[in-house]
Amino acid sequence: MENLIDFSDPILRLVLPILLKDQTTGKNIIWATDPPPKVDCGPMGEITMEQLDRIRLMPRVQKRLSEQKKRTKGKAEVFTPLWVVKKMADHAEQELNKGDWEQFVHERCLEIACGEAPFLTSRYDPTTGEPVAIPDRVGILDRKLRAIQENANHKFQWKALVLSAYQSVYGYEYQGDNLLLARVNLFLTFTENWIEKLGLPISTSWAIAVATRISWNIWQMDGLKDTVPGTDTLCLIFDWEENKEVTFRQIKEESDNV
């Protein structure tokens, strides 16, 4: 099975400090699970670049079967087959896409307890580990990017709409290693689409802009309390339309009152 995520990739390493950041605390995201033995810290310890240089952080499908079973038993961690992801994402797209492709790109959506974020981007099959070609990906972000690929008239429009697509997708996850994998998957989806569409080296400024949006929109949270795991601190997210920080709980309460 090929390496699905290469943490030595220069453009990924450039933005890793951003992808590791918890925008609520201003620190790095925490493990919030039992870290690998080589890490030498507890569940409340931050995930750092130095740790990632010592271990091989990999998607669930590439872990030993015994480790997968341990996570399923201890953390209720299960991953959805790609065909199920597709059927559910088909339904979500029907709700979001009313025929105006550009409006579809801007429609906001949230993947709860997102794990490695397969409902946003399906870079690989969660159960087999097989890479999925860009035209065959089924996540909601994948579909937004495909709409942009098919309809954007020039590269400037393409870039602006891709940024809007990333501003429109949200997800939260408790366990820090899964959260980082989700963030990295979204970032690599950007770089892969950039190369496919533009055929140019990745722009540093655009890579940073996309990574910043990912670090705000895909965040670490205890979904039962709306807080940073192990604390009473309410999680912040960013409302890109209003250009301001808000608590996730505030968004929930406003939605309940609609």
Segments (PLM) and residue ranges:
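Conserved S-adenosyl-L-methionine
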Residues: 87, 95-227
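Short conserved micro-motifs at the rims of enzyme active sites and ligand-binding pockets
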Residues: 229-231
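A short N-terminal interaction module
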Residues: 1-79, 83, 91, 99-104
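Proteins with a high burden of low-complexity, intrinsically disordered sequence enriched in S/T/G/P/A and R
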Residues: 77, 93, 99-100, 166-168, ...
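Helix N-cap and loop-to-helix transition residues
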Residues: 80-81, 175, 247
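Long, low-complexity, polar/charged, intrinsically disordered or flexibly structured peripheral segments
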Residues: 49, 235-258
